[in-house]
Amino acid sequence: MLGEVNRLISSRGLDAMTTAAVVAYYREENVAKVSYAGHPPVLYRRAAEKAWSFAKPQGRKGLNNGPPMNIPLSVEPDTPYGQLTIPMTIGDQLFVYTDGIIDAPSPGGEPFGLARLKDALDANEGASLSDLKSAVLETLNHYTEKELSHDDVTLIALEIC
């Protein structure tokens, strides 16, 4: 799907790019399938575990080492986008977010980053999805010492039922 969207956007001749993540859950197979186009990695937490893990996309491998993956949309018209498969069971959770979260700067200019995001999620084990999102935003606002306004900030938290 991302390949087709990429070709469509690229054909418009716009001097712009964007990121995207597609997450689909297949109940019959008990898996989530994730594809990235320049997007930060989804986090997942198994119901039986306390810590969150990154569903890491493959980086750009180069011309002779296979197809590029996780390239933003509209950068290369014929980019083949890969897909990660995450086995899921009841109670497992997924956390999808935009780069506005990890790029949010401290007053000194240091980005919030992936490690702080994971730490914020890990620190709120057992929280409802709504409380989990609120805790991440509260941690982020405390880190930046202000309400976020520099970039888009979107959080999606899902639990397999």
Identify the residue ranges that each predicted region occupies:
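Conserved subregion of the PPM/PP2C metallophosphatase catalytic domain
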Residues: 1-161
